[in-house]
UniProtKB/Swiss-Prot annotation:
GO terms for cellular component: cytoplasm. It holds the Pfam family Maf. It catalyses: dTTP + H2O = dTMP + diphosphate + H(+); UTP + H2O = UMP + diphosphate + H(+). It is found in: Cytoplasm. It comes from the Bacteria. Nucleoside triphosphate pyrophosphatase that hydrolyzes dTTP and UTP. May have a dual role in cell division arrest and in preventing the incorporation of modified nucleotides into cellular nucleic acids. This is dTTP/UTP pyrophosphatase. NCBIfam families: maf. CDD domains: Maf. The keyword ATP-binding does not apply. The record marks R19, T78, Q160 as: Important for substrate specificity. It comes from Flavobacterium psychrophilum (strain ATCC 49511 / DSM 21280 / CIP 103535 / JIP02/86). Belongs to the Maf family. YhdE subfamily.
Amino acid sequence: MLRKKFENTKIILASGSPRRQEFFKNLDLDFEVRLKEIEEIFPKTLQSLEITDYLAKLKASAFDGDLLQNELLVTSDTLVWLQNEALGKPKDYDDAFAMLQKLSNQTHEVITSVCFKTKNKTEIINDITQVTFGKLSDEAIKYYLDNYKPFDKAGSYGIQEWIGLIGITNIHGSYTNVVGLPTEKVYLYLLNHTF
């Protein structure tokens, strides 16, 4: 349904995430991937949703002056929020192990902000999903890290992977948001806005 609406607009997805690219493909969108390296650093005073909003906008600002009139840029950022602490992508194996130990037997929030930028305007949408892990043994965490290497994922896990299948006991909200993009909200935004 969106293909016709965007036949004269070039959608640019600024994400190296294979999961986000697959979602865009499955939404039947014609898009191009363009990447720019930015340092994902945020002011320590920011909390929760403020962090992902800030980082999604920061990623979009890297394209200031580069967009043509008929181009729509999409950037996003996802993080795990647990007890007033942001868990982004792990620095290394030990950091990933520690994150999963913290998530064990706890409910956390997965927060994603998506920024839509054209030559003339920037808008942002976001989503929050609550996810509960049961008790994860150190042996299960080690097995997961050794075999799935989730070092490119916020919170050091993929809900669609082994650890999600054996460890997640409850989810309240958007499943696709936990994977990395709230597709339902993205689709409705694209459907209902003019670019």
